[in-house]
Amino acid sequence: MTQFGVVVLTMGSRPLELRAAIDSVGKQVNVDTDIVVVGNGWVPTDIPTGVKTLALRENIGIPAGRNAGVPEVDGEILFFLDDDAELPDPRFLERMAKLLSSRPEIGLIQPRVIDPTGKHAPGRWVPRPRAGDHARSGPATTLWEGATVIRRNVFEGAGGWPGEFFYAHEGIDLVWRVWDQGYVAWYAGDIEVNHPVINPTRHSEFHRMQARNRVWLARRNLPAAIAPFYVGSWTALTMVKLAKPGNTEARGAYLDGLREGMANPPSDRTPMKWSTAWQLARAGRPPIY
């Protein structure tokens, strides 16, 4: 049977949801799972027997926390699950394994995300422009990271999640690097995961990190000729969105993030091939916006 290395990242603030997430993985059939719960600044407690734990002394951020869990698990396929997500189908991982087996060109898969209470899923959960029909599968150019399936060799080839990002846009970085290895990132609209609709701006550092990491995305991954267009287009779009009265603080935080990203170069600059930029354009989102 296919073995999945499963990494569940948590800060320990949602014990009921965490247990539901773990249990939903434990109920998967026709696959083997090796599970680790990574406590990001928290010592995991009350974890089911047979599930590994890793306690990080401090909160090192979402992407770095996920990376820390990878060496703890075996499996040729990795599965990253948020602590407030849940698998409603006991064949979720089996279906993912079959998709990867039948489509060797696919390196990463994001499932369709459903709010279990019936709230309308936001368009940002569909990793392509013109979200439209959320049930339609196809190539992914961005990523909702809360239930990510990826081949281990592809993950390692990408250098893992960009740990220094801490929060925001780490999924785009990973998706770009999947494409740059010659693989396809895929949205499986027929395979579902449950996750509540949550306002991303609840994080106090949201706007600063959005801006800083946009700059770092460009500096890490884009050819020098198009990097300024990517940063410029997103800056213009964001400033228009934040132009309404009452957003003065948010605009200031965004500009602070831009300055931070420009002043502090990220690690591991690996400009994507021009052929990758073309593939992303053919998939619906050229890396200039």
Model-derived features: where do they sit?
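Conserved donor NDP-sugar-binding/catalytic core segment of glycosyltransferases
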Residues: 90-121
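Short, acidic, metal-binding catalytic loop of nucleotide-sugar glycosyltransferases
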Residues: 23-32
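Non-catalytic, C-terminal membrane-associated alpha-helical segments of glycosyltransferases
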Residues: 209, 226-289
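Short aromatic/hydrophobic "clamp" motif used to bind/position activated sugar donors
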Residues: 78
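N-proximal low-complexity "stem/linker" segments adjacent to membrane-targeting elements
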Residues: 1-24
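Glycine-rich, basic loop-to-helix element that forms the pyrophosphate-binding segment
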Residues: 55-73
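A recurrent flexible, glycine/aromatic-enriched loop bordering the glycosyltransferase active site
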Residues: 115, 132-150, 172, 202
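A short, conserved alpha-helix in the catalytic core of glycosyltransferases
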Residues: 142-150, 154-159, 164-192
